[in-house]
């Protein structure tokens, strides 16, 4: 049986500092909020801003050292209590056990043979920590008054977790005591570990995540110290950055969507037991049974007794896994890198290209993706590139010519080129673009592989270098693939080969051999990460919770086929009101949080 323990707040002991007055921290957090609320830095200035923000955060952390909430013992000491609590409240606890798998960390191990598609795990709603349970908790009064909490479910869930952790008699203590004491998300990276990500695509999201989390903490520190509805929160006397970083990471690595009790909408939830499962390639096998009001998971494959039980977290890139889940997944069949493309408004054919793209349902500017698997581009990216490289005559054919509608619908089908010349142009463009992106990195693929052989690297440093290496390998594969395609279509053009007759096809825009089953992935703005989060506006901030940002440790969500996070679906007007409300209250509490 796990060691019984009451939650405690460390106020003395090794490394603990003298008690710091709230006023002193208020001054520091005000400075931090001001710094984090400044306009986005110009090109090449992101690292400088990151270091400045980090310096302030570290100053706060140093003054708060020893004041964070902790538990006695190790998390595994409390596993028996978790299993007992889960069993007493209707969850399944037979057929598996929690085990430390070393490199993968803790996970579930089968204690009997489990067949593929067999229901082996279910967790009833009463055990879940949700936005709804947050509203009905001690956090409720503040939630009802704070627009940021209302607009950003992930932050509400993080505060719910903090409040329950600080309450020894909380119903969820058996679960909370088994959560990791720290994570490997970039919020926990040392400055030198983040430095390994410089010049990568992922580093922009890392900077944004860190800045947004610091801004949130600074804003809510003042709220907790000054808002009348925060007086009864157990965080009143101790709300440290360390605590908030832990809560944000716990939520971003574990949150999932489930239906509300009436099934009319979705809400965010933490799901005990189930969130112990580690990831592998496959399909989402978790759903929510509204009739029995419980989360259910069937086996992804046959698992023999003694084997680790895996689930599929969703079609996420390694950048998403590292930033939002804190791990790198080798051989990720869904890995990809972003590529921002757009038709220039100075292009004399802009209007015609924009019209063709609009008819195909594709924006004139978007974040697409280059994939790890073949083919490296999706049907929508193929369609965009075809339009991007069209001549005036080809554009007219797609707008006014015979069978113009059919031409639009086959834009994304690799079997029906617009023209051989168009294919040569688009693959040449893609080859050049990917080559240019490769040149922006400060190290080569060979250099990264050499560095990884250094056994002195920390786990997080290795993860960062693997991510850097993975980006370059995807780009290199795209260059090679584009070159092969370019030469193939050049040969077709030289031989004056007849073009396939598109009229014979009933295939739609996205039903292409060049496409893949992930569509329309490339037009999702790559989820809550919203592109690379350049020049985040206040509205973008509130409608997209950085703490959430795709941070699903156990799957895209708990509903099959993976809808996205609550924040992605926020009504824009509600988000706008949330910001305005936060702004209006700045004179009383703090400036608005701008994520």
Curated annotation (Swiss-Prot):
The modification Phosphoserine is found at residue 513. It is an enzyme of class 2 (transferase). Keywords: Actin-binding, Cytoplasm, Methyltransferase, Nucleus, Phosphoprotein, S-adenosyl-L-methionine, Transferase, Ubl conjugation. Residues 573-595 have a biased composition (Basic and acidic residues). It comes from the Eukaryota. Pfam families: Rubis-subs-bind, SET. One of its GO terms (cellular component) is cytoplasm. The SET domain specifically recognizes and binds actin, suggesting that it does not accommodate substrates diverging from actin. Interacts with MYOD1. PANTHER family: ACTIN-HISTIDINE N-METHYLTRANSFERASE (PTHR13271:SF47), UNCHARACTERIZED PUTATIVE METHYLTRANSFERASE (PTHR13271). Protein-histidine N-methyltransferase that specifically mediates 3-methylhistidine (tele-methylhistidine) methylation of actin at 'His-73'. Histidine methylation of actin is required for smooth muscle contraction of the laboring uterus during delivery. Does not have protein-lysine N-methyltransferase activity and probably only catalyzes histidine methylation of actin. This is Actin-histidine N-methyltransferase. It comes from Callithrix jacchus. The gene is SETD3.
């Amino acid at each position: 049986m796990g060691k019984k323990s009451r939650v405690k707040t460390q106020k003395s002991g090794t490394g603990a500092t003298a008690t710091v007055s709230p006023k002193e921290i208020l001054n520091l957090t005000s400075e931090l909020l001001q710094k984090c609320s400044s306009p986005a830095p110009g090109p090449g200035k992101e690292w400088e801003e990151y270091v400045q923000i980090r310096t302030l955060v570290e100053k706060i952390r140093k003054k708060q050292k020893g004041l964070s909430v902790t538990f006695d013992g190790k998390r595994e000491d409390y596993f028996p209590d978790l299993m007992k609590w889960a069993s007493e409240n209707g969850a399944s606890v037979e057929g598996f056990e929690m085990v430390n798998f070393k490199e993968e960390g803790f996970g579930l191990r089968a204690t009997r043979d489990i067949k593929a598609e067999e229901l082996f795990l279910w967790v009833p709603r009463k055990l879940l920590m949700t936005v709804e349970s947050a509203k009905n908790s001690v956090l409720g009064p503040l939630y009802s008054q704070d627009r940021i909490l209302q607009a950003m479910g992930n932050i509400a869930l993080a505060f719910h977790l903090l409040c329950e952790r600080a309450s020894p008699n909380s119903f969820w203590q058996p679960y909370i005591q088994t959560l990791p004491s720290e994570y490997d998300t970039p919020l926990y990276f040392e400055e030198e570990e983040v430095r390994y990500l410089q010049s990568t695509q992922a580093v922009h999201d890392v900077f944004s995540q860190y800045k947004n989390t610091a801004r949130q903490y600074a804003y809510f520190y003042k709220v907790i110290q000054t808002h009348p509805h925060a007086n009864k929160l157990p965080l009143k006397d101790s709300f440290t950055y360390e605590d908030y970083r832990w809560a944000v990471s716990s939520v971003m690595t574990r949150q999932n969507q489930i239906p509300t009790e009436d099934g009319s909408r979705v809400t965010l939830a933490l799901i005990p037991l189930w969130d112990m499962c580690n990831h592998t390639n496959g399909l989402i096998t978790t759903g929510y049974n509204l009739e029995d009001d419980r989360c259910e998971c069937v086996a992804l494959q046959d698992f023999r007794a003694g084997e680790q039980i895996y689930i599929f977290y969703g079609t996420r890139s390694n950048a998403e896994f590292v930033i939002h889940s804190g791990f790198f997944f080798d051989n990720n069949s869904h890995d990809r890198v972003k590529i921002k493309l757009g038709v220039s408004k100075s292009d004399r054919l802009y209007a015609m290209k924009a019209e063709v793209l609009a008819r195909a349902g594709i924006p004139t500017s978007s974040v697409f993706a280059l994939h790890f698997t073949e083919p490296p581009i999706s049907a929508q990216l193929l369609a965009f590139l075809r339009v991007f490289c069209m001549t005036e005559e080809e554009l007219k054919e797609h707008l006014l010519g015979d069978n113009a509608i059919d031409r639009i619908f086959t834009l994304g089908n690799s079997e029906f080129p617009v023209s051989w010349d168009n294919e040569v142009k688009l693959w040449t463009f893609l080859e050049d673009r990917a080559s240019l992106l490769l040149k922006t990195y400060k190290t080569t693929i060979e250099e990264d592989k050499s560095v990884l052989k250094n056994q002195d690297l920390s786990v997080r440093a290795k993860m960062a270098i693997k991510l850097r290496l993975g980006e370059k390998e995807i780009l290199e594969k795209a260059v090679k693939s584009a070159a092969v395609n370019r030469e193939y279509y050049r040969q077709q053009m030289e031989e004056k080969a007849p073009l396939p007759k598109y009229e014979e096809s009933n295939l739609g825009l996205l039903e292409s051999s060049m496409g893949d089953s992930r569509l329309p992935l490339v037009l999702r703005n790559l989820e809550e990460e919203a592109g690379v989060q350049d020049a985040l506006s206040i509205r973008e901030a509130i409608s997209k919770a950085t703490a959430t940002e795709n941070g699903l440790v156990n799957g895209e969500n708990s509903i099959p086929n993976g809808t996205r996070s609550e924040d992605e679906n926020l009504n824009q007007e509600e988000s706008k009101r949330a910001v305005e409300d936060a702004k209006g209250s700045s004179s009383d509490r703090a400036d608005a949080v701008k994520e």
